[in-house]
Amino acid sequence: LPMHQLTVQQAREQFDQSSALMDPGLDEPLPRVETLFVPARDGTPLPARLYSPQGLSASPRLPGVLYLHGGGYVVGSLDSHDALCASLAERAGCVVLSLAYRLAPEWRFPTAAEDAEDAWCWLAAEAAR
């Protein structure tokens, strides 16, 4: 069925499953992946994954990327773009923070945008440490 004919939950499941088909296939080494929580301005802990390239672990500072998955603010997840974030971190030699921002329709605008801004501020503060 087309996505617009599915329930929100069905659309999210279909999106995650179809995203697995776009796995870029990363050769070893795989990046280090840390699951963490980024604090939102309202105190909500937002799930996130931090991908760090294996080969550059001795480098004192690496470029950082805040990765916000696609999906029109309704579908998409940390899992739907996991392989892409891993590939980006390893191939570009950067740290990638992938954020599980809050999705519509459960969360109204501008929640997702605020979550993204909060994650950006968190990433910048962590980089300065």
Q: What name fits each language-model region?
A:
Residues 1-46, 50:
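A glycine/proline-hinged amphipathic helix-loop "lid/cap" segment
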Residues 48, 60-72:
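Short beta-strand element of the alpha/beta-hydrolase
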Residues 54, 95, 100-104:
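Short beta-to-alpha linker loops that shape the active-site pocket of alpha/beta-hydrolase fold enzymes
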Residues 57-60, 129:
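Glycine-rich phosphate-binding loop signature in dinucleotide/nucleotide-binding domains
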Residues 67, 72-75, 80, 96, ...:
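Serine-hydrolase catalytic-loop signature spanning alpha/beta hydrolases and amidase-signature enzymes
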Residues 73-74, 102-106:
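Short strand->helix junction
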Residues 78-99, 114:
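Short amphipathic alpha-helix adjacent to the substrate-entry channel of hydrolases
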Residues 107-128:
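Alpha/beta-hydrolase active-site loop
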